[in-house]
């Protein structure tokens, strides 16, 4: 799944470490999400969207693999 997490993080002048602490996850989790190597749980995806004050689909873009 593609995402705009890095864009929103930069928009708010947050480091990966800052965002990880605010969301209660590891920096490695943020890195993996930004690189598209890890899809967050639905709970975490909603938490991220709420943190930035946007809709979940503004950050995460679903791509049909078929």
From Swiss-Prot:
Keyword Transcription in record: yes
Family annotation (SMART domains): HTH_XRE
Feature: DNA-binding region: 16-35
Organism: Methanocaldococcus jannaschii (strain ATCC 43067 / DSM 2661 / JAL-1 / JCM 10045 / NBRC 100440) (Methanococcus jannaschii)
Database matches in Pfam families: HTH_3
InterPro entries per UniProt: Cro/C1-type_HTH (IPR001387), Lambda_DNA-bd_dom_sf (IPR010982)
Keyword list, A-Z: DNA-binding, Transcription, Transcription regulation
Protein name: Uncharacterized HTH-type transcriptional regulator MJ0272
One function term, GO molecular function aspect: DNA binding
């Amino acid at each position: 799944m593609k995402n705009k997490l890095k864009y929103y993080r930069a928009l708010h002048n947050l480091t990966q470490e800052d965002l990880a602490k605010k969301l209660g996850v590891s920096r490695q989790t943020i890195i993996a999400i930004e690189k598209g190597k890890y899809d967050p749980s639905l709970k975490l995806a909603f938490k991220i969207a709420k943190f930035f004050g946007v809709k979940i689909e503004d950050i995460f873009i679903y791509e049909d693999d078929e």
